[in-house]
Amino acid sequence: MIYQSVANRKKGEKMKWITRERVKVDRVACPWLIKKFVDKAAEFYFVPTDQVASEARRMGAIPFDAPGVELGHHGKECSFEAIVKEYRLAGDLALVLLARIVNGADTDNTLYNQPEGPGLGAIAEGFRHLGFENDLEINAAEWIVYDALYAYCQQMVRLGKLEGAFK
């Protein structure tokens, strides 16, 4: 059960989301997905792993990409995929392809063997070494990568290449 949804929040209230600090792939991709497709006014908090559950309860925030949470890894699926499913976004085939790429970057890439995944993983790792002050800054800087990947995925869907250009 998700703690908060777009439909049940009070008028003007922002959805709060919380995850582990020291972002990499899923903890950048998920906030991008949430802001673009779930709640444009969402707020994000990044805390030590052992504080995610307690801070989520205290703040009334939705935990994601943390051990044991509903919107986390399940089997070989990543948190991005869990959010796509929970918020019924799988009708957007470009998002489905993007989810496969994110999975390939965030996991061992054996579920889909998505060729674009390792490249995204390398880019995400590079952002961690550019000297940003905090996780919010990394997210702000890196979202352009997800905008570009989503545009790529949309083009692949238009061309009928639902598994991307390299498969």
Locations of the language-model features?
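Active-site-proximal structural scaffolding
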Residues: 26-27, 139
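Glycine-rich, often proline-containing surface loops adjacent to acidic residues and nearby aromatics
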Residues: 13-16, 123
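A charged, amphipathic interaction segment
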Residues: 85-167
